[in-house]
Amino acid sequence: MIIGIGTDLANIERIERTLERFGDRFRHRVFTEREQRKADSRQQTAATYAKRWAAKEACSKALGTGLRMGISWRDMAVQNLETGQPTMYVTGWAAERLKQLTPEGHEAVIHVSLTDDHPWAQAYVVISAIPLEAAARSA
């Protein structure tokens, strides 16, 4: 069952200007160390940061809060599986909110899709809840 959907569109050039203006202050406030390493190792650094920015915005919308109720940027982290598929990990208040949304006897799964086409980066997040029995069978 779907328990949350969020989408966001970010301007890559705006993120690039923000990186130039605020540098590490911006990076450290919004992105985890792992996200920073990933983006800084890419040729299209600003596009990588913009996609992750959009993913965090989309996730906060899927959680039904936006960036309120104590949820901070670094409570949501985009990571990639070995296949390259993006995933979202939540901690802190974002994890608490996810727990509140997840029905008893279910496990939450966060699905993430990222894309960019200069000057835009887009993210789409769907949070679903699957019964624990189904989760155990698919593991």
From Swiss-Prot:
It catalyses: apo-[ACP] + CoA = holo-[ACP] + adenosine 3',5'-bisphosphate + H(+). Keywords: Cytoplasm, Fatty acid biosynthesis, Fatty acid metabolism, Lipid biosynthesis, Lipid metabolism, Magnesium, Metal-binding, Transferase. Its EC number is 2.7.8.7. Transmembrane segments: none annotated. Belongs to the P-Pant transferase superfamily. AcpS family. SUPFAM superfamilies: 4'-phosphopantetheinyl transferase. GO terms for cellular component: cytoplasm. It is found in: Cytoplasm. The keyword Magnesium applies. GO terms for molecular function: holo-[acyl-carrier-protein] synthase activity; magnesium ion binding. This is Holo-[acyl-carrier-protein] synthase.
